[in-house]
A protein has these predicted regions:
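Tubulin/FtsZ superfamily GTPase core signature
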Residues: 1-175
Length: 175
């Protein structure tokens, strides 16, 4: 089962046309996601406000529902740095491992221009994820830089989604 966690992962997986489940604290983003199964978490559905603690707590509160998504082998897809992907992914990984699932992850690392705070949160999120996931593919978005000066921000993030989608496909194909 592929589980996309957060806004970035939902966008990434929606480009691939593969079956997947999506978990998000932002219910509007979840609604627009192409997932086969959608699990809204959080009390109000307004996102985690770039706060991983809120993302983690929302996942803890939804642990039973998350467990129903975890079968045999789980591929987690998440963007690190913000609140939902960073905070929720380690909780989902822990739940999946507790059920005996083999867990792999593909995560994106923030662009250098996204902020020092996002880089720090990404580092902490990756460390938390490593406790439960033996194989993590980190897609470093800085590898897309430098960009032509006239590149729109929307296009930059679209390129990032495609780079991450390629990593997901490579991971599914195996070594």
């Amino acid at each position: 089962m592929i589980i996309a966690i957060g806004c970035a992962a939902g966008r990434i997986m929606s480009t691939l046309g593969l079956p997947f489940a999506a978990i998000n604290t932002d219910w509007r983003e979840l609604e627009n996601c192409a997932a086969d199964s959608k699990l809204p978490i959080s009390e109000f559905g307004l996102g985690a406000g770039a706060n991983p603690v809120i993302g983690a707590q929302a996942a803890e509160d939804a642990a039973e529902a998350i467990a129903t998504l975890c079968m045999e082998s789980v591929l987690l897809v998440a963007g690190l740095g913000g609140g939902t992907g960073t905070g929720t992914a380690p909780v989902v990984a822990r739940i999946a491992r507790a059920q005996g699932c083999e867990v792999t992850a593909v995560v994106t690392w923030p662009f250098p221009f996204e902020s020092r705070r996002w880089a720090q949160q990404a580092r902490r999120g990756l460390t938390a994820l490593q406790a439960y996931v033996p194989r993590i593919v980190v897609v470093k978005l800085r590898e897309l830089l430098p960009l032509p000066p006239a590149t729109r921000l929307r296009d930059v993030f679209e390129m990032a989604d495609h780079k991450a989608a390629s990593a997901v496909m490579d991971t599914l194909r195996g070594p």
